């Protein structure tokens, strides 16, 4: 019997119902500690590149003056360092939330403290996300660099070269998605193998995902309906705020977005954790035993 997507999703919802504290509360803490906090910090820091771009579009200022005033080395360096720290912090928190959800999917009764698991192995957590970012970028450059060259030449060669450049950009985007799916299980391997290095986890993820990238992509698409429904509901709630003014629209939209994310996030991540357990271990760990699928041999076990 092969991977059963509806069953994996049903088990994720069942795990959410039986986990205490409720995953929605833990997800709320995660969202407050990660996206909300980092967005607040980012809003307090001036983006010199963004400001430079806006002033250039205005065409009322001399570019040399803009560079001298806005792109001050100290300001640029401070902005880049802060953005780097924010990115690393988001990676570490994402590692912790993945740890929490994997434990939830396995009925291990995780708690809020599992959100900090990334800080307990900060070197491995940071390195795995860094390597994934580097590898994904390098693979994308295989098409982006030729696309950039073709775009420059197309200024002299006509629309056909521009069309070719567009195809190369699309190919780069598709390749980036494929590469991202190759590495989707790397964090799970680190969580299951405390002695495994980041590069080894990425290698194991690539091997495990052979023949499974399409299945995981379809699983991700299966949540699209919920996202569309949420978008409609958020728009409806926001329209009700028109009665009270634009401030109410923003507040109601944020509340609707947050409420939906609190439910959908652990649901999606829990389903992915079940996908990992099936592909790598050949069963869903939420069950006390392998059940009727006990005889199934994971394709990954052949490696």
PLM regions: where:
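Hydrophobic alpha-helical membrane segments
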Residues: 1-303
